[in-house]
């Protein structure tokens, strides 16, 4: 599908391991199945609760349009986006940092950081899997629970 820069399945390995900081937000630590990626993500747990060992599909896209064209830059309440209907939880945010792994052991590791209205995400893994990310790019996060 056009506009998608990342798509993988993740398994929740822990929830709020450092304790719960906010009433309606949980921090989830997840591991990917296909690309050996690590995901740390804050989610509004009142709207979309997850628990340990849940499996989710995570898609990161630059647009919600099926044709891949950029969004208009304004919210259109009449717009229909079939991509949204395929998922249970959707957020809009911005990539604010890309960071190389300086450990020197694996060499090709990269971490992408994004903020979705203050809910943070870190996606870390092989740089080849994060090649479409740029600082200050707008990003849609689409998620749904799945069995795999």
Swiss-Prot record:
GO cellular component, one term: RNA polymerase I complex
Domain of life: Eukaryota
Main location: nucleus
Cellular localisation: Nucleus
GO molecular function terms noted in the UniProt entry: DNA binding; DNA-directed RNA polymerase activity
Keyword rRNA-binding in record: no
SMART domains: RPOL8c
Residue segments, region Non-specific ssDNA binding: 16-40
GO BP, one annotated term: DNA-templated transcription
Keyword list, A-Z: DNA-binding, DNA-directed RNA polymerase, Nucleus, Transcription
Family membership noted in the UniProt record: Belongs to the eukaryotic RPB8 RNA polymerase subunit family.
Role noted for this protein: DNA-dependent RNA polymerase catalyzes the transcription of DNA into RNA using the four ribonucleoside triphosphates as substrates. Common component of RNA polymerases I, II and III which synthesize ribosomal RNA precursors, mRNA precursors and many functional non-coding RNAs, and small RNAs, such as 5S rRNA and tRNAs, respectively.
Quaternary context: Component of the RNA polymerase I (Pol I), RNA polymerase II (Pol II) and RNA polymerase III (Pol III) complexes consisting of at least 13, 12 and 17 subunits, respectively. Directly interacts with POLR2A.
Stated name of the protein: Probable DNA-directed RNA polymerases I, II, and III subunit RPABC3
Encoding gene (name): rpb-8
